[in-house]
C-alpha cells in the first residue's frame, strides 16, 4: 500500500506540472494533449519505478507501527550493521536497530504514525489538484490497483507472509538455541516471546529427565528409615535388659550347688521350698512366653519356611532336657535365615567401608579374606574353650552351702605369686562380653554428644583467650584507689565520765528496789 501511494503521488505531481504548462493553449487541445501526455508518461513512470532500486520503499515492520501513540520514536544511526542475511538467519543486531531492512521477515522502511498521517494529507491534496485539472479518477484507481498488484508480485510479499505462517505452525520444541539467537529482533515483544519459548523448552526438558527420587522411591526410603529406627530402638531395649540381668546372674551364681541342694532344703522350713518352686515356675513361664513370641515373629516372616507340624509349647511341668530340645529345634529352623541375613548385611557393610576407605581394600588382612560365615564357624569350632571362659570365676563371692576357703587360701599365697584361675561348672560369668557391650555403649554416647562437648571445649578455649579488662589510664596514680568500708550498726563510741562519790550504804539501799534498806533496818 505504501508503494502504491508513493507511485500515485509521483504520477499526480508529474501530471499536474505538465497540465499547467498546457493551460495557455486552447481548451480542447490542452485536454487532448494532457491525456496523451498522461497516457505516455504513466507507463514510463511505472517502468522507472519498477526498475529503479533507489525509489522503491519496501514494506514496513508492522510491529514497529505506533497504532496507539505510546511507543518511542526510533532514532536513526550512522552505525554500520554489516550485511543482513536472508530468511531471518543473520546474527542478532547490537545497538540501535536500522531504520530500513532490505531483506528478511521485516523488509522495508520503518515509519511512524505521524509520517503516515502526513503522507495521507499530501495524497488527499494531490487528488484534489488532479480533480481540478480534470483528471480521470476512475482510470487512476484502476491504474493504482494494477500497480499495487504488480509490486506485490515483484516483492513476493504475500508468499513471504505465507511462508512465515507455515514456519510458525511447524515450530518444534527441539529447535536449537543458536537458531533463536540468530533471529533479528525488532522489538521488546519479540524478545519476550523468545524468552518465554526458551523457558517452556527448559521445563519440558526437565520433565523428560529421569528423577533421582520418585514417589515410589521416596516411600521406600521412608520405610527403610523407619525400619532402621525401630531396629535401633529394639537394640537399645535389649541392651538395657542385659544390663538389668547382670545383677540376677550374679545372684544366681551364689545359689547352692545340686549336691547340697536337697540338704539345704531339708534343713530349712517349708516356706523356702515354696519360694524355690515359685521361682522355678516363673522362670519356665518366662521361657515359654519368649518362645511363643519368637514363633509368632517367624510366622510373620515370609523368608522363613513354614512349619507343617503342630506348634510345640513349653510347659512348666516339662523337664529341663525337653525344654532345651524344643528350643534347639527352633534354632535349627532359623539357622538358614540367620546365615542369609548375616551374609547380606556383612556384604553391604564391606562395600560401604571400601567406598569410605577410597577403594584401598581395608578388609584384605582380616582372616585371610574369609567370609563372615567361615569366620564364625572357625570361632565356634573351639567350643570347649568358649564354654570354659563362661565358667571362670572372675569375682570373689560366697556360694551358699560351701565353706569359706577363699580367705584362707588368699592368706597363704604370697603377694608376688600369681593366683591360678578358678573354674566352676555350676556358674555362668560373661563379664568380659558384658564389659565389651558397656564400652560400645559408652563410645556411641560419646559420639552422639561429640557435637555438644566440642562446643563446650571451644567455649572454654575462648574464655581462656579472652583478655581481661584493664584500665590503662589507672597507672601512675591518675585514678584514686580506695575501698568503701561497710557502715557500723548498733555501736556507739565510749565516752569518759568522772566517777561519782557514792556512799556505799546508800548504794546497797537502792539495790533490788529498796530491799537492801529493809534488811538493814531489820538488822
UniProtKB/Swiss-Prot annotation:
InterPro entries (alphabetical): AATF, AATF/Bfr2, AATF_C
Membrane-spanning parts: none
Annotated Acidic residues bias: 117-130, 138-182
Pfam families, A to Z: AATF-Che1 (PF13339), TRAUB (PF08164)
Biased composition (Basic and acidic residues): 87-97, 200-210
Region Disordered: start-end pairs: 1-36, 51-187, 200-224
Biased composition (Polar residues): 1-14
Cystine residue pairs: none
One of the record's GO cellular component terms: nucleolus
Protein family according to the UniProt entry: Belongs to the AATF family.
Name recorded for this polypeptide: Putative uncharacterized protein DDB_G0270496
Amino acid at each position: 500500500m505504501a508503494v502504491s501511494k508513493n507511485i500515485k503521488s509521483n504520477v499526480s505531481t508529474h501530471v499536474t506540472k505538465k497540465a499547467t504548462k498546457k493551460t495557455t493553449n486552447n481548451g480542447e487541445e490542452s485536454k487532448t494533449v494532457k491525456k496523451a501526455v498522461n497516457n505516455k508518461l504513466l507507463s514510463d513512470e511505472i517502468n522507472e519505478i519498477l526498475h529503479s532500486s533507489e525509489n522503491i520503499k519496501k514494506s514496513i515492520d508492522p510491529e514497529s507501527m505506533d497504532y496507539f501513540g505510546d511507543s518511542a520514536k526510533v532514532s536513526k544511526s550512522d552505525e554500520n550493521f554489516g550485511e543482513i542475511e536472508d530468511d531471518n538467519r543473520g546474527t542478532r543486531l547490537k545497538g540501535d536497530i536500522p531504520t530500513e531492512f532490505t531483506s528478511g521477515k521485516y523488509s522495508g522502511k520503518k515509519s511512524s504514525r505521524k509520517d503516515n498521517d502526513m503522507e495521507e494529507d499530501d495524497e488527499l491534496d494531490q487528488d484534489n489538484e488532479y480533480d481540478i485539472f480534470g483528471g480521470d479518477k476512475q482510470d487512476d484507481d484502476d491504474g493504482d490497483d494494477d500497480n499495487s498488484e504488480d509490486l506485490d508480485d515483484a516483492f513476493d510479499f504475500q508468499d513471504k507472509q505465507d511462508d512465515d505462517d507455515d514456519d510458525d505452525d511447524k515450530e518444534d520444541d527441539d529447535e536449537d538455541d543458536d537458531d533463536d539467537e540468530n533471529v533479528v529482533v525488532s522489538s521488546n515483544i519479540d524478545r519476550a516471546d523468545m524468552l518465554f519459548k526458551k523457558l517452556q523448552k527448559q521445563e519440558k526438558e526437565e520433565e523428560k529427565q529421569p528423577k533421582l527420587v520418585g514417589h515410589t522411591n521416596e516411600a521406600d526410603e521412608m520405610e527403610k528409615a523407619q525400619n532402621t529406627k525401630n531396629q535401633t530402638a529394639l537394640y537399645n531395649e535389649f541392651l538395657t535388659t542385659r544390663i538389668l540381668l547382670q545383677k540376677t546372674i550374679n545372684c544366681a551364681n551364689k545359689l547352692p550347688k545340686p549336691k547340697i541342694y536337697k540338704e539345704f532344703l531339708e534343713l530349712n522350713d517349708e516356706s523356702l521350698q515354696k519360694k524355690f518352686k515359685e521361682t522355678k515356675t516363673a522362670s519356665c513361664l518366662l521361657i515359654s512366653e519368649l518362645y511363643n513370641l519368637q514363633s509368632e515373629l517367624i510366622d510373620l516372616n515370609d523368608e522363613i519356611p513354614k512349619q507343617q507340624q503342630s506348634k510345640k509349647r513349653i510347659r512348666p511341668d516339662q523337664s529341663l532336657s525337653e525344654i532345651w530340645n524344643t528350643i534347639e529345634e527352633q534354632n535349627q529352623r532359623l539357622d538358614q535365615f540367620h546365615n542369609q541375613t548375616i551374609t547380606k548385611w556383612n556384604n553391604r557393610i564391606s562395600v560401604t567401608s571400601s567406598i569410605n576407605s577410597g577403594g584401598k581394600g581395608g578388609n584384605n588382612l582380616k582372616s585371610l579374606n574369609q567370609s563372615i560365615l567361615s569366620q564364625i564357624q572357625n570361632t565356634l569350632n573351639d567350643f570347649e574353650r568358649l564354654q570354659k571362659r563362661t565358667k571362670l570365676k572372675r569375682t570373689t563371692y560366697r556360694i551358699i552351702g560351701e565353706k569359706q576357703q577363699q580367705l584362707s587360701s588368699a592368706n597363704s599365697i604370697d603377694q608376688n605369686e600369681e593366683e591360678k584361675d578358678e573354674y566352676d561348672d555350676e556358674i555362668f560369668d560373661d563379664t568380659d562380653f558384658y564389659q565389651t557391650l558397656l564400652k560400645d555403649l559408652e563410645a556411641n554416647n560419646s559420639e552422639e554428644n561429640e557435637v555438644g562437648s566440642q562446643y563446650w571445649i571451644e567455649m572454654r578455649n575462648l574464655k581462656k583467650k579472652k583478655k581481661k579488662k584493664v584500665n590503662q589510664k589507672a597507672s601512675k596514680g591518675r585514678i584514686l584507689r580506695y575501698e568503701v568500708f561497710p557502715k557500723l550498726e548498733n555501736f556507739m563510741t565510749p565516752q569518759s565520765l568522772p566517777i561519782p562519790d557514792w556512799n556505799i550504804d546508800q548504794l546497797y539501799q537502792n539495790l533490788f528496789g529498796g530491799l537492801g534498806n529493809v534488811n538493814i533496818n531489820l538488822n
